[in-house]
Amino acid sequence: MTKLCTVTLVLLLALYCRAEERPAAVTPQQVDEIVDHLLSGLGDYVFPEVAEKLQSQIRAHRSEYRAISDSNALAARLTEDLRAVGRDHHLTVSFGEELGVQKEPTSAEKQHAHAFDLADGHGIRSARRLPGNIGYVDLAYFSPDSDAGTALAAAMQLVSGTDALIVDLRRNGGGSGETATALLSYFFEEVTQLSSIVERKNGQPLERQKWTMPYVAGPRYVGKPVFILVSLRTHSAAELCAYDLKNTHRATIVGERSGGDANSSTGGEIALGYGFSAMIPNGQTRSPITHGNWQGTGVEPDVATTASDALVAAYKLALTDAKPSVESEGLTKERQLALQDPQAALAEEITGFQKK
């Protein structure tokens, strides 16, 4: 399992596993040690010039931190100060969630995480055929579980016979980069470079290229229209999917501008001591097409709508752009009725999004 998947597994474990009991109060001396470890870790922040500003911010408020004895309040204050300068939602200091920072999850913990992820459908909220032979897949997150690829293949198999596909990432906050790459791989016939990850380790830059997979477990979805739904709640790996598909002209992006989180922590969490840990992004995604990314700006949709209207808008486009693979009187009538009243055809999906 990669470091990124391990980090995501830890986040899943936190949903149902209590972290090791730790005192809720910290002494000024302990705060000094925590801050020193944080300052050291900030040296590998993805942007060196910002790293210096972050360190200056933390040093400037050291005396204020020493006056905070509540561990949760200290973690919140450190996070607030880091984000005020870095404008990076991945910059986080946590207390009581250090599980897995210094050691791999145990076998029992992994089994619990697998059971939780299985019960949650590996993040796949829905995979179905909509009226008019349009596919719809709703992904709440990109699961790090070893069976996530199999679940994704099953979803893609179900929609493989549709004439156009809508992938709903409006509620997707990210997750496993490997699973996100697996999804992207279904939409390309040939192995394609999607991006590069430029990271810093010990102050030195290192670049790794990201390509689509040469093999996917289900049928590829090529030669047919694809629409990606995004919103302000779309983050990280979900934004990566939207950004890559937009820039390769493989999909039409519909909805709101996304959250704007392109930086990543390729090394996982950093232990700060006394139950504290920090997520310090040391990597950034870089497109070979734009030579940039979506950090701070979000992914701009091709078709701008509100989040709640995105599905209807994409559905109309899909019905219009799709080339029917099979002609029949029944399918023709179904498409015509869907175009006349797409909201009625999508009542279940629209209601579900607005309620959540």
Q: Which residues does each PLM region occupy?
A:
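STAS-typified acidic loop motif
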Residues: 124-149
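Gly/Ser/Thr-rich loop/hinge elements
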Residues: 175-225, 263-272, 280-284, 288
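Low-complexity, Gly/Ser/Thr/Pro-rich intrinsically disordered linker/tail segments
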Residues: 292-356
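Extended, small/polar residue-biased N-terminal targeting/export presequences
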Residues: 46-132, 328-356
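Solvent-exposed loop/turn segments at secondary-structure junctions
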Residues: 97-101, 141-145, 171-177, 193-194, ...
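Bacterial N-terminal signal peptides
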Residues: 5-14
